């Protein structure tokens, strides 16, 4: 059986039933405390200090937190505090002021209560590495106003390296049985108004417990260890119960049980100011550890996309846009067949659709047939024909370009025949970077014809066809008065800037998926601050994070930490791109002065001036063929270097500067 390596495992368990001075007694608090104490001692190896009823008077409680615990608690150890009793909350200057009610408290005399802020300050002064408080009392959630920040939720899979980090780094967490404005139930009735709830294996059948305490003991017995699920004859779980997993288990059970009694009670979790990258953990009784190693870290396993957009293959690394994904998904049930996803350059329009909407649609809506994502390019009719080829027999596919160019009704007919063969399916066409109808289409007439084809097929087949297009906001005016103007206002879906919480998810969660950490954790705050006020900065952020990851690989460290020192050396979010572009340019010119002219040639091809602003332009490789073999060799070297540096993106039919990369280059 595995063991946790802590200098000490100490639990202080308090339960008060018999209050004096006219305060209503409780029925289960002492039984809850005794059962929790037994569980911790017998199944989790804790040394337990159990205090009940008169031992929970104000004097002994203050002595406990101010004198006994500082003398008992060891550095490098772990401490668990459990309290079952009365609690109240009153309005304070900075939110609800919470109090634990000692056994000898006087009703209405605040001086006879134990302020949660005093408890917080005394506890956070202790030298232990891990601390977990569990409060089962009314208004217990008021304790969060004494804490500093919400907890960070751990990924579904716990790797060995993350478990080691959880144990070694400070973990200071609090789980409460009720929110700051909720009462906690003493006994939950399942049969009548004073029934009992079974406390689980190993407990006396007639014993009664609060819903929270009963769920807590079931969770600590192994109920909260449910990930990964059971498979191949192996039980569910990995042998570890984290505080976060325990909280989720408690929330799911207590909320349902208490809501059934019309007395909703919502457990909460938060962290204290001492908390860092640790997590309070328990080992599951009778379960061997089953922790996979963290994924290998190499250039191919980079969790950040740099200047490239996310595709469906990268959906497991795409975070921060859940709300917008759900909104887009809902539009596919609306009567409006066209959705135009609008945003300034660098807001992640393409990624939202390709890595957000499409994977979620595939998971939830098997009735949708999704065509491959298309981009108009310089021949939009040809691009549309290539995408629609999968809707027709192979013998017809070769004639599609000519059909669509000659006959506006051809697309209507093709989609109609597909629907006859698939009457229960819906069809989705995604047009990415629709501004290419202006920036790249070689014929304005063909660009307009493309819009007319789209408009007509929507009008004819609106009951089963949906179209989602992405478009840079600065090109919107050039489409509003064209063929689609009648549908435009209903079609608009403007991506809002990311909130700080969304940015935090986009920064931290891809790193968590690779079991990477930010050192110090405040580096995440710095990254958020650097991009929060910069419209369209997501590609710059992603590039900086990608470079930060590559710096980690170059250091050959084994701590899996992305560091603030490396971030400063990169020049921050904005400076990292310019620094990398300058580095590649200077290295090329050092090899041969002729590269200065070649780089200029290549990069000027990748931008276009539209409406007084620079726009990225995808360049067919045929445009980068020059008169001499020597120059062509230099062009190929430039492209290889810029692509390898993730400054330029190679597609099937050409190359383009990464979003936000063209100007820097």
What is the role of each PLM region?
Residues 1-301:
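Cysteine endopeptidase catalytic domains of the caspase/legumain-like
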Residues 154, 162-165, 200, 225-232, ...:
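Amphipathic helix/helix-loop-helix segment enriched in hydrophobic residues with interspersed Lys/Arg
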């Amino acid at each position: 059986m595995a063991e946790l390596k802590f200098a000490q495992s100490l639990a202080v368990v308090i339960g008060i039933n018999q209050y004096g001075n006219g305060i209503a007694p409780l029925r289960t608090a002492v039984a809850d405390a005794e059962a929790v104490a037994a569980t911790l001692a017998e199944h989790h190896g804790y040394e337990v200090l159990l205090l009940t009823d008169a031992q929970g008077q104000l004097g002994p409680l203050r002595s406990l937190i101010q004198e006994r615990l500082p003398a008992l608690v060891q550095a490098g150890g772990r401490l668990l505090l459990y309290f079952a009793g009365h609690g109240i909350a009153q309005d304070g200057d900075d939110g609800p002021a919470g109090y634990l009610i000692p056994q000898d408290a006087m009703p209405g005399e605040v001086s006879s209560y134990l302020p949660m802020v005093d408890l917080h300050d005394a506890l956070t002064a202790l030298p232990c590495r891990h601390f977990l408080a569990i409060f089962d009392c009314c208004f217990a959630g008021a304790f969060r106003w004494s804490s500093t920040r919400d907890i960070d939720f751990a990924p579904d899979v716990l790797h060995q390296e993350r478990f080691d980090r959880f144990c070694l780094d400070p973990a200071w967490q609090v789980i409460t049985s009720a929110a700051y404005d909720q009462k906690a139930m003493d006994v939950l009735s399942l049969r009548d108004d004073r029934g009992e709830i079974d406390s689980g294996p190993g407990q006396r059948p007639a014993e009664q417990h609060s819903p929270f305490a009963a769920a807590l003991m079931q969770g600590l017995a192994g109920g909260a260890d449910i990930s990964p699920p059971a498979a191949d004859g192996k039980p569910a779980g990995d042998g570890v119960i984290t505080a976060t997993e325990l909280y989720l288990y408690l929330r799911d059970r207590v909320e349902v049980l208490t809501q059934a009694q019309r007395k909703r009670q919502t457990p909460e979790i938060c962290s204290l100011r001492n908390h860092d990258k640790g997590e309070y953990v328990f080992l599951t009784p009778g379960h061997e550890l089953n922790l996979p190693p963290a994924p290998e870290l190499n250039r191919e396993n980079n969790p950040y996309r740099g200047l490239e957009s996310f595709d469906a293959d990268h959906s497991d690394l795409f975070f921060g846009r859940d709300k917008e994904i759900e909104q887009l998904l809902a539009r596919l049930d609306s009567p409006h067949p066209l959705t135009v996803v609008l945003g300034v350059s660098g807001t992640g329009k393409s990624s939202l659709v390709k890595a957000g909407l499409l994977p979620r649609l595939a998971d939830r809506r098997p009735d949708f047939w999704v065509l491959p994502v298309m981009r108009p390019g310089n021949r939009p009719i040809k691009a549309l024909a290539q995408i629609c080829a999968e809707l027709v027999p192979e013998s017809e596919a070769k004639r599609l370009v000519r059909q669509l160019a000659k006959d506006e009704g051809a697309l209507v007919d093709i989609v109609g025949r597909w629907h006859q063969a698939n009457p229960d399916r819906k069809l989705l066409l995604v047009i990415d970077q629709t501004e290419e109808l202006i920036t790249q289409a070689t014929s304005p007439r063909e660009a307009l014809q493309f819009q007319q084809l789209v408009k007509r097929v929507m009008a004819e087949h609106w009951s089963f066809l949906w179209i989602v297009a992405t478009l840079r906001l600065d090109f919107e005016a050039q489409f509003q008065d064209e063929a689609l103007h009648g549908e435009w206002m209903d079609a608009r879906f403007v991506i809002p800037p990311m909130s700080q919480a969304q940015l935090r998810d986009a920064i931290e969660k891809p790193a968590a998926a690779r079991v990477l950490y930010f050192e110090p954790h405040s580096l995440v705050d710095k990254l958020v601050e650097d991009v929060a006020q910069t419209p369209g900065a997501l590609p710059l952020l992603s590039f900086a994070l990608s470079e930060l990851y590559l710096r980690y690989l170059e250091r050959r460290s084994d701590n899996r930490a992305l560091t603030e020192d490396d971030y400063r050396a990169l020049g921050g979010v904005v400076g990292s791109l310019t620094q990398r572009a300058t580095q590649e340019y200077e290295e090329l010119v050092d090899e041969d002065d002729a590269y200065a002219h070649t780089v200029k040639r290549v990069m000027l091809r990748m931008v276009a001036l539209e409406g007084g602003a620079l726009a990225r332009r995808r360049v067919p490789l045929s445009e980068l063929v020059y008169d001499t073999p020597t120059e062509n060799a230099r062009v190929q070297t430039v492209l290889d270097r810029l692509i390898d540096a993730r400054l330029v993106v190679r597609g099937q039919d050409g190359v383009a500067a990464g979003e936000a990369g063209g100007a820097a280059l």
